[in-house]
Every structure is written in C-alpha cells, then in structure tokens.
A protein has these predicted regions:
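Metal-associated gating/positioning segment near the N- to mid-region
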Residues: 1-53, 70
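Short acidic/polar active-site loop segments enriched in Thr and Asp
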Residues: 24-26, 56, 81-84
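Alpha-helix-loop-beta-strand connector modules within alpha/beta enzyme cores
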Residues: 40-60, 103-120
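Structural detector of well-ordered beta-strand residues that form the stable sheet scaffold
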Residues: 27-28, 59, 116, 171
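Active-site mouth loops of central-metabolism enzymes
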Residues: 1-10, 31-33, 57-70, 90-93, ...
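Histidine/acidic residue-rich metal-binding segments in metalloenzymes
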Residues: 70-174
Length: 174
C-alpha cells in the first residue's frame, strides 16, 4: 500500500484476511487524496487497489490534502457515490487553512457528510521541531516534546469553533 512516499508490506488481501480471521466483517481505510485530485478520483484510485483482493466488506474515509474551488465542490459527487467520511489535517504543510476548513464543514453538512480532523497547530509544531533540531535533540522523545498538549488543544478549540460557526458535526480523531 502506498503512503507518504513509501510502500507498506501489507495489501488489501492480507489486511482484510486478518480482519476476517478476527471476526471483523467490514473495514474502513483512509484513502489519502493526491494534489489536484477530486474526492471521487481519490475513491476510485484506492478502490481499484481494494476491489480485486478484499476478503471482507470495505469502504474509505477520504484524507483531504487539497481542497479549493472545484475540489471543494467535488465532495458532492463523492457523497453521491456513498463516501460520507472525510479527514482533514490542520497540521503538516498540506494542512487545511481555517477559511477552507469552514467551507468544507458547511459543504459536508449540506451533503450529510462527517468531517474528522487531525488537529494540531502546524506553525507551533514546526517552530518547536526546528528548535529541537537546532539544539541537536533528535531522539524520538523530541518528536513528542515538539507536540505539547497546548498545540493540540488550541487547534481542537479552533476546529470546534469553526464547526459551531458552520453548524456542522465534527469528529476529532485525537
């Protein structure tokens, strides 16, 4: 499975067979959107990998990386084919900006979709990461230290306020 420039050793057959052995009959995977790709195209690309090999029922949450203009409107088409769960990121360089996040929340409500959010303040994470790297502090512990509680708390509060303003449901993943 492709992810973040790497390929995992797992595939849909191995993963869904393991699920079936454990008694799980339906799985949801994250299909991470490529840049300039509609939500439907993201679904179709990932579905092409799963369909030939899945041993149980499956569906996808679309991981939103690029959402503007026509791509924002593509949520309707994806909802029309049954994709009603989307994950946005407030962190990472591709993270959604607040104005676009608000628009996506409003669109999701209109079409009955649910937005999940990975909420962290990207600027603070980057600032703290750069600080620790410049000090030579690169052990795994400093990954944790570069993401203190307030970094997530601030972004959670912002996401909740945007959802309230859009009168839309929101799922905070962690």
């Amino acid at each position: 499975m492709p992810f973040g420039g790497t390929v995992s050793s797992d595939d849909y057959f191995a993963g869904t067979r393991a699920a079936a052995c454990g008694g799980t009959t339906t799985v949801f995977d994250f299909a991470l959107q490529d840049f300039n790709e509609t939500m439907t195209d993201t679904f179709n690309r990932r579905n092409a990998l799963a369909a030939p090999d899945a041993a149980v029922d499956y569906s996808f949450h679309i991981g939103v990386k690029d959402i503007h203009g026509d791509l924002l409107d593509s949520i309707k088409d994806a909802c029309d084919i049954g994709v009603t769960s989307y994950k946005v990121f407030m962190v990472y360089d591709f993270g959604v900006k607040d104005g676009v996040f608000y628009q996506l929340l409003a669109k999701s409500k209109e079409f009955g979709a649910l937005i999940a959010v990975h909420a962290e303040n990207n600027e603070l994470v980057n600032t703290l990461t750069e600080k620790y790297i410049s000090e030579g502090k690169t052990d795994a512990w400093y990954h944790y230290m570069s993401r203190p509680e307030f970094v997530e708390g601030e972004a959670d509060e912002r996401a909740i306020n945007l959802a309230k303003a859009a009168n839309a449901p929101l799922y905070i993943v962690h």
